[in-house]
């Protein structure tokens, strides 16, 4: 969330002159006394969270904080003082906490980095204004008061006795540690949360251009014919639609088969939907480096062609009148645009677009229970797109450490109905079996959304170390966080059979019941904990389609990443409150999950290519690496932990090395991982405890590779080949026949 230091201004800098007949000293004293009543903050908590206009009467958070909601359409006045550039701000940041009693200058930045939204990769592009800006004259002593939403950065002098604390010093030192690894931490990121998000694409491209590895390419303006566009639409449907099912397959087939050629180039909502799918399909082709070959043009002209179709979809949404009825296709277009930025690892833009989509869905009453007179198909479509958009908003909020637009109190929409947790009968066709699996996937994803939304509402996960240190509600927050982690682990253990990985299959017990064969992190002991979770033994199943295996892996990664993001602040708090057992428990669990995520991804990338087109897995890698960096910074790792850390970093380097050749974001993360691995080796005495895995030999025969990769590496546990090919196997083992094409 967004926090400011609510301090009385000691020496207010003013550009005006004192009144006639009044001394400067008297003027300064009067200013100090009237400062608390003259501060105005232009955003209440409700408006920041919902991104909507304040109502005529004060909203509930404002009544609780003794403040008043004010709606105004006036433009914010210009700042009296000269704005400070972010570059000068980062260069002049104090390296150590000043002495008590002195004052430091603290920047107050706006909630939105810019009053307009642009999609240009270099900062250009036509603006997309954020409509209905809100303002709130809030009481200056409220804990959640927000600074002005204007684009200016003002100065405010704050006593260091109210600012400096052991927790604050630890946070700043951790940021200096990250800067030493090559990670640029801005002042805004340092104030909002301790763990910076994934480096933006612009930063990665700058470093890449400097290194001369990936040449910059202009935006392509060519227009594909219908056959070429249809290929990328199908590529999107095969790669991303199973993970983000925006519509049934029958409706998708009817959309492009009947009206596709007519909608080509039309500024309609159906044409915008096809353009959004085309942009994501080209983006998937670019992720594998095959975009130029498919487009039959030069690599320079093809590398950025997807942005053209993104803009066409965006322009249709921007030209729509907000007074018109919001249809299902409109929310689907918002989902596609948000996915486009997520695939490009532009979390800031995805966060803003998800917020706009949630607000548009509120205007169309998608968050409410469908009307009784609505048909079953329309009601299902509305529920599905609402929960999918809600998850995208919650996911972006979780990654950036910002409030979500979806709130528990304003979300009465029921989750998607879950079919019976069993397999579809053998006589059902392939489409019916796939839709049944997608229904299970939607239900599990909506369950994850509800758990995370409740956690973000109840647990101050992203509050600063200064507020956590010495807080009276710290014990309640940690108890609520522990309950959230247990809910996430229980939900992961209760996944339906279709979405279970092979290593997580249920085995019968002596009393006839079933249980998971793997332990969870909450049930594992603290001392000498090894990476034995499910992620470290990830396995693929022979005969299953790629879309189903992606669903299994991405779901497990989402659950592990949510637990990791919720628990990783305790790694830094462990340095301050080392005697607290609950903080130590969460810190050790975060370390174990970070190693598990990297081990799981390394296992998948070394055996298959089913995740090659999904660049959205990069935030999972980044969160694990930055958690390991915090653990290294705290310096509480023994020899066994250092061995696990080096093994995890070697896994990360093995994953990022091929990705860095085609993805600028991966290159930046790869460079930071190299610096962190060097720090670990230096701390371990200069020796690499865990050697990098050797590359496969070219002399390996085809039969040996087939046997090792397809059978020996894919099955774990007690399952063998004879049992898999037996006619009397269980439904779980016979899953490949149900989904054979």
Curated annotation (Swiss-Prot):
Keyword terms, alphabetized: Coiled coil, DNA-binding, Metal-binding, Nucleus, Virulence, Zinc
Record's GO cellular component terms: nucleus
Family matches, as Pfam families: Fungal_trans (PF04082), Zn_clus (PF00172)
Protein biosynthesis in keyword set: no
InterPro entries cross-referenced by the UniProt entry: AtrR-like (IPR050987), Transcription_factor_dom_fun (IPR007219), Zn2-C6_fun-type_DNA-bd_sf (IPR036864), Zn2Cys6_DnaBD (IPR001138)
Keyword Metal-binding belongs to the record: yes
GO molecular function terms attached to this record: DNA binding; DNA-binding transcription factor activity, RNA polymerase II-specific; zinc ion binding
Gene disruption phenotype: With the exception of OpS5, disables the expression of other genes associated with oosporein biosynthesis.
Gene3D superfamilies in the record: Zn(2)-C6 fungal-type DNA-binding domain
Positions of the DNA-binding region: 44-69
Biased composition regions of type Low complexity, renumbered to the chain: 20-34
Coiled-coil portions: 473-500
Cell compartment(s), UniProt: Nucleus
Gene Ontology terms describing biological process: DNA-templated transcription
SUPFAM superfamilies listed in its UniProt record: Zn2/Cys6 DNA-binding domain (SSF57701)
Chain spans, region Disordered: 16-39, 139-167, 501-528
Bias (Polar residues) ranges: 506-528
Predominant cellular place of this UniProt entry's protein: nucleus
Known role: Transcription factor involved in regulation of gene cluster that mediates the biosynthesis of oosporein, a metabolite required for fungal virulence that acts by evading host immunity to facilitate fungal multiplication in insects. Binds oosporein cluster genes at a conserved 5'-CGGA-3' motif with the exception of OpS5. The presence of this motif in the OpS3 promoter would suggest the formation of a positive feedback loop for self-activation.
Protein name: Oosporein cluster regulator OpS3
Native source organism of the sequence: Beauveria bassiana (strain ARSEF 2860) (White muscardine disease fungus)
Classification lineage: Eukaryota, Fungi, Dikarya, Ascomycota, Pezizomycotina
Gene this chain is encoded by: OpS3
